[in-house]
């Protein structure tokens, strides 16, 4: 899985999917007051599945296009370096490309000597290599597919919980769905902790707080 989509991107997709499902379950429950439990269960379930699927498709398409455009951006930069006759200009461009990602967190993470050395090695390597124009490949399609999968996966627990509305009060079912959402948010934060952090659990608590705050804001603004 993570050879195609990063843990962070997977977590973000699942987070958005949870927010979408929780928002729909709360807003539609209010909008359908007075409807029969069977109607509420059906409408909420279809809406959550449909909206999360649509969001997953849209986000997957955006991910695919963004990845391709980013690859094209770097391809043009590398092509400029390869075809450039001015060696110093090529080194400056190489240093710019190499340091873009590394200096995102801290501008001075690379000193001048390191930049110069990296640029020289990069220019030499690029001059020797054949540069192929990037195309949309299998990995990018798989990333787009995982965006869809993560959004749909986030919807399934809420669809399952709302089936209880045929047997339990709908207010209780909505409460159970919200509690389940908070639990999923916590474990999503724990997942990020294990993958990217120090595993102290704070990210889980932060994720619950952030998710619930955003849910309240979204519902208050009309969903």
Model-assigned labels for residue ranges:
Residues 1-58:
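Cytosolic-side membrane-entry/anchor segment at the start of a transmembrane helix
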Residues 8-19, 131-182:
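Transmembrane alpha-helical segments and their cytosolic interface motifs
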Residues 32, 63, 67-75, 163, ...:
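Transmembrane helix-loop junctions in multipass membrane proteins, especially transporters and channels
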Residues 45-79:
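Hydrophobic alpha-helical membrane-embedded segments
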Residues 46, 50-55, 181, 185, ...:
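Alpha-helical transmembrane segments in multi-pass membrane proteins
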Residues 74-147:
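Cytosol/matrix-facing amphipathic helices and coiled-coil assembly/linker segments
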Residues 187-212:
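Interfacial loop-to-transmembrane junctions
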Residues 215-223:
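Juxtamembrane boundary at the C-terminal end of a transmembrane helix
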């Amino acid at each position: 899985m993570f050879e195609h989509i990063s843990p962070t991107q997977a977590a973000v997709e699942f987070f958005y999917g949870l927010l979408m499902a929780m928002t729909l379950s709360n807003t539609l429950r209010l909008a359908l007051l007075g409807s029969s439990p069977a109607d509420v269960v059906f409408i909420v379930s279809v809406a959550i599945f449909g909206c999360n699927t649509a969001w997953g498709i849209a986000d997957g398409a955006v991910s695919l296009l963004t990845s391709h455009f980013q690859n094209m951006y770097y391809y043009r930069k590398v092509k400029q370096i390869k075809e450039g006759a001015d060696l110093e200009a090529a080194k400056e461009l190489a240093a710019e490309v190499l340091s873009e990602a590394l200096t995102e967190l801290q501008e001075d993470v690379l000193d001048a000597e390191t930049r110069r050395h990296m640029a020289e090695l990069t220019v030499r390597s690029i001059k020797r290599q054949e540069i192929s124009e990037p195309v949309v490949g299998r990995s990018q399609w798989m990333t787009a597919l995982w965006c869809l999968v993560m959004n749909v996966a986030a919807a399934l627990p809420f669809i399952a919980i709302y089936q209880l509305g045929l047997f339990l009060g709908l207010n209780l079912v909505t409460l159970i769905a919200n509690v389940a959402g908070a639990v999923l948010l916590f474990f999503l934060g724990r997942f990020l902790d294990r993958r990217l952090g120090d595993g102290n659990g704070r990210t889980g608590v932060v994720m619950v707080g952030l998710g619930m705050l955003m849910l309240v804001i979204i519902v208050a603004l009309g969903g």
